[in-house]
Amino acid sequence: MDIKEYSKLIKAKRKELDDLMKRKMPVIAGRMAKDHFQDNFRREGFVNGGLHPWPKAKRLSSGRTDAAGQYGTLLSGRNHLFSSVKYVPADYRVRVADDLMYAPLHNWGGEVHPTVTPQMRRFAWAKYYQASGKAKKAATGKKKGKKKGSAASNEPQENPEALKWKRLALTKKKKLRIRIPQRQFIGESKELSDKITKKTENEIRNILNL
């Protein structure tokens, strides 16, 4: 096929090619991007020129045996962050995003300074009992002292996860300073760009019967 024949073929297929780039590829590329970014959660790292592993969540090394201790970093029983990755196709383009309020904080890292409220303390106590495996004791109105040498004074040390929640429940601070490490899951990715380029080229070849 010489250049004139190729130019004639392009003109004949112009409508199909335009429909591909305007309508079909934004949907195809969006789906590919969503799958790629969600796979970052499963791999626990960001893929761009290779896998860049995330810092491990502290709960994974806390010795917890409950369900929460088994989920990977940034994953949970509800998977809000994972499930909120979405794509919105438009003419000749597609927007891929995670619109959860705290998504940018995890994606880029940073600090938050939440106010310590009574609700937060109650939540911390609930998480403490969950992480420690202890049953919440009913209030009796009486305080019992620990006798020296008693079984109570020889209780095993609490695991780091439970201790973290206990400290939060008992803190005297009015505001907290919490640093969130970067765990990028959305952004420019060489591997994703290469896959989309290859898919686009294949779709064009199919239209031109090349």
Where are these regions (language model features)?
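Short, Lys/Arg-rich flexible segments
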Residues: M1-L210
